[in-house]
């Protein structure tokens, strides 16, 4: 009797292993530490970096610099916590954000706390990146060929999506590492172009650093929206465990060591991308800067066209980094819950449908700036600023009023404030601009 039972559980284990070897997050575990560096850069340095001077113009110098630097420190701290908690259970790896959530809050509750937020972030980012990709392609076309007949954004988004209908079928994180590396290099390049071209232009003769809005109400709401933009700029946490899952781990060399090395490199790159763009862009253009600094810099045309093309390449990589965990969730549900056979056909259909879905939403709702502030506070703040801290308090139980305890509560309070305040600003921006928005523009 024992033998057959034994074999039944072995069969189950073998089946589980087969599924794990097939799923995108867990299938390949041979990443080097520098993979984690450029995956993290690609995930974190969003096209959001180009809206930082605009955010600065709504925050002003004092609050602006404070919030930028503070966000950088807090998010680095919460990222460190996640890297540490990846192997908090000896001999087991928490490969996905929701697995860590389930370990901290229990099977059911953990899923319900993490998965909806993670999906809002990942699908939200992918939709925003569809819009960004399409808009940047359109901009390149306008710059390179100013006399051509204008092509609607809708078609540019479709052209951008066509790339993803192909590369979404790469099986896992390691197979997109070349794309991700290219994307990380691009984000550095266009950030550098953005601030270097600003410096080259020189400070505007009548530069003005007073708040952009004329009314007090406007100032407050713009401030809140800018908070969302900055919070959104540091949001690589949704994919950090999934990236760490690709790194091999042994008792002598746990995965957190190479992962942390990669994260540090990534954060230095993030600082090199963000701070010069935000501060120099604001210093030079003051409150006349557009919500995408590349629009403010019209000349030299070839350089700005190139920068926009780099944005496109970067966004291709970012889209994939954020789509991979979604593919993983979809495929897990289909194979484990609905007992589909893990096959290429299944993968081909689910991923194509996902790309089509993000494309259609992007085409219907191409308003970029307002959505960022709204989603930023709503889903990014929790997953980036305070969920890791709450999990840390639950799992590590630091001493009350000790350094760790205080730091975590500080992050939680800041994060909760962001969650409440940023969407208010974002929503108002959406409402004000909605009058001029056209669906299917």
Curated annotation (Swiss-Prot):
The keyword rRNA-binding belongs to this UniProt entry's keyword annotation: no
Protein localization: Cell membrane
InterPro entries: AA_transpt_TM (IPR013057)
Regulation: Inhibited by diethylstibestrol (DES), 2,4-dinitrophenol (DNP) and carbonlycyanide m-chlorophenylhydrazone (CCCP).
GO molecular function, one term: symporter activity
Side of membrane Cytoplasmic, spans: 1-32, 80-110, 174-175, 244-263, 322-347, 397-406
Example GO BP: amino acid transport
Record-level GO cellular component terms: plasma membrane
Entry's pH dependence statement: Optimum pH is 4-5.
Record function comment: Amino acid-proton symporter. Transporter with a broad specificity for neutral and acidic amino acids. Basic amino acids are only marginally transported. Involved in import of amino acids into the tapetum cells for synthesis of compounds important for microspore structure.
PANTHER family noted in UniProt: OS05G0424000 PROTEIN-RELATED
Similarity section: Belongs to the amino acid/polyamine transporter 2 family. Amino acid/auxin permease (AAAP) (TC 2.A.18.2) subfamily.
Full protein name: Lysine histidine transporter 2
Species: Arabidopsis thaliana (Mouse-ear cress)
Gene that this polypeptide is encoded by: LHT2
């Amino acid at each position: 009797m024992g033998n057959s039972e034994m074999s039944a559980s072995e069969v189950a284990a073998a089946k589980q292993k087969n599924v794990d070897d097939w799923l995108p997050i867990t299938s390949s575990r041979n990443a080097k530490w520098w993979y984690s560096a450029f995956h993290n850069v690609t995930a974190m340095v969003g096209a959001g970096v180009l809206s930082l001077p605009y955010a600065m113009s709504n925050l002003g110098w004092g609050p602006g610099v404070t919030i930028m630097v503070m966000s950088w420190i807090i998010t680095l701290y919460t990222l460190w916590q996640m890297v540490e908690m990846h192997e908090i259970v000896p001999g087991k790896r928490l490969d996905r954000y929701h697995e860590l959530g389930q370990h901290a809050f229990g099977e059911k509750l953990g899923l319900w706390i993490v998965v909806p937020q993670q999906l809002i972030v990942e699908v939200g980012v992918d939709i925003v990146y569809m819009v960004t990709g399409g808009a940047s392609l359109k901009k390149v076309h306008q710059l390179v060929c100013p006399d051509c007949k204008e092509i609607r954004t809708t078609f540019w988004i479709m052209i951008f999506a066509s790339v993803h209908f192909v590369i979404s079928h790469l099986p896992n994180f390691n197979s997109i590492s070349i794309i991700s590396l290219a994307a990380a290099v691009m984000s550095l390049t266009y950030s550098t172009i953005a601030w270097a071209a600003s410096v080259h232009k020189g400070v505007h003769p009548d530069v003005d650093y007073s708040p952009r809005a004329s009314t007090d109400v406007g100032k407050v709401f713009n401030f809140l929206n800018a908070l969302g933009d900055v919070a959104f700029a540091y949001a690589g946490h949704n994919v950090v465990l999934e990236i760490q899952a690709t790194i091999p781990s042994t008792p002598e060399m746990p995965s957190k060591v190479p992962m942390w090395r990669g994260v540090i490199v990534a954060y230095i790159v993030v600082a090199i991308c963000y701070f010069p763009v935000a501060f120099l862009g604001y210093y030079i253009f003051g409150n006349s800067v557009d919500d995408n600094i590349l629009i403010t810099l019209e000349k030299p045309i070839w350089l700005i066209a190139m920068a926009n093309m780099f944005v496109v390449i970067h966004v291709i990589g970012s889209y994939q980094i954020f789509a991979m965990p979604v593919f993983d969730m979809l495929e897990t549900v289909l194979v484990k819950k609905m007992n589909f056979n893990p096959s290429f056909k299944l993968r081909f259909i689910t991923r194509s449908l996902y790309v089509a879905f993000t494309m259609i939403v992007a085409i219907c709702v191409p308003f970029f700036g307002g959505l960022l502030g709204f989603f930023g506070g709503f889903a990014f703040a929790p997953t980036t600023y305070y969920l890791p801290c709450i999990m840390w308090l639950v799992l590590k139980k630091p001493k009350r009023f000790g350094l760790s305890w205080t730091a975590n509560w500080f992050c939680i309070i800041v994060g909760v404030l962001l969650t409440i305040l940023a969407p208010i600003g974002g929503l108002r921006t959406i409402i004000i601009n909605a009058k001029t928005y056209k669906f299917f523009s």
